[in-house]
Amino acid sequence: FMGSGFSESFSLPGESMKYGEFFYPGIVLMLLLFAAIFSTITLIEDRTAGFLQGVLVAPVSRLSIVAGKIMGGTAIALLQAIIFLAFAPLAGIALSLNSLFLLITLCVIIGLGFTGLGFMVAWFMDTVAGYHAVMSVFFIPLWLLSGALFPVEGAAEWLGWVMRFNPVTYAMEVLRMAFYARPSELIYNIQFLRALAVAGGWSLLTMTLSVLIVRWRSDV
């Protein structure tokens, strides 16, 4: 609906892309974000029910606990993203099998990052209401300032700097490039490889920190 509404008033310099085509990758990113948020909310519910305490005293490694939660949340996010990708032709986007495979791979990487971030926040939250508050002031701005709604190049200078320091901006960049460029071309694209390195590093960092936090703070 937003793509249709802004289609005649949006244009990129030197591009013939309509807003629906520009915004579509942003919706995929939003699906990954919200799936991660809602899958990690269950961590708080598990603590309230006493289930998490039982898991922590069981003879399993902290790594297994974190990996299971993060991979489960990522699987849910990936399923939602794949379903949404099936509707890409409605936005005027034609995807080849190679592009689809690349997009699914990127969704896994980004989903791991979002779920790892959600895990870290949920681990310190005592109530679902508190988690929702963090979601409003932290998670949503990450998406809004990622270039999902408007290009970084067209933003005010100060806002552009903020967006460049946002790791989700680079996740948005690799997704958008995967939608509109051939995978064979992206292998040699420095901009794509740089953004992929940042997005992948961010995902690895959130997962590593999640494991360290669980090992450090097990008194739930």
Specify the residue positions occupied by each region the protein language model found.
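Hydrophobic alpha-helical transmembrane segments of multi-pass membrane transport proteins
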Residues: 1-4, 19-91, 118, 137
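Transmembrane helix segments
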Residues: 2-7, 122-169
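Short helix-terminus and kink motifs of transmembrane alpha helices
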Residues: 38-50, 115-122, 129, 153, ...
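Hydrophobic alpha-helical transmembrane segments
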Residues: 1-17, 218-220
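Membrane-interfacial helix-loop-helix junctions in multi-pass membrane proteins
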Residues: 11-14, 147-204
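Residue-level signal for alpha-helical transmembrane segments in multi-pass membrane proteins
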Residues: 1-4, 86-91, 145-146, 176, ...
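Short amphipathic alpha-helical coupling elements at transmembrane boundaries
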Residues: 49-57, 126, 136, 160-164, ...
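Alpha-helical transmembrane segments and their short interhelical loops
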Residues: 62-136, 140, 186, 190-211
